[in-house]
Amino acid sequence: FVARAAGAFVQLPGCEPMSGGPPADRLEALCRGECYRPSAKRKPIVRIEVIRIQPQNKPDEPIATLVKDPWRTFPCPPSDAGCKVEFDDPEFTRDTTYYIRAIEEASPAVNGGGLRCDKSGKCKPCYGDYRVDFKDDCLAPVEERAWSSPIFVRKAP
């Protein structure tokens, strides 16, 4: 198998000026600088993961041994061209489904921290409305990911 992945386009700061739209200060208040404004540069892919899923051959076969998430992990060297990996499955003996998951370098994302709970269990969700201080940008680092379509491979009879 060969898998290739390229990261998302790095976004330029702020929003493009609009004609006929809201004034720049209003747009900034609404969007907080989160407009789609791609540059030519891409975010780095740090690793590619392969997920392997095999169907049960009999009803009492344990499922936990059939789902490997991840089954294989390939680190990706920094590259503007993205990442390319090759692999095979030397253990292939039955019908199998594979997924490829590409992981970008961690970057700040709105609500990336989920409920933002501390060790005592007290949570501080980012609702995105009056319940959250306007100065709280709700940013937290996340590793954005993309999935391939499933790859179904049948064992020849």
Regions found by a protein language model. Give the residues of each.
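C-terminal functional module detector
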Residues: 1-157
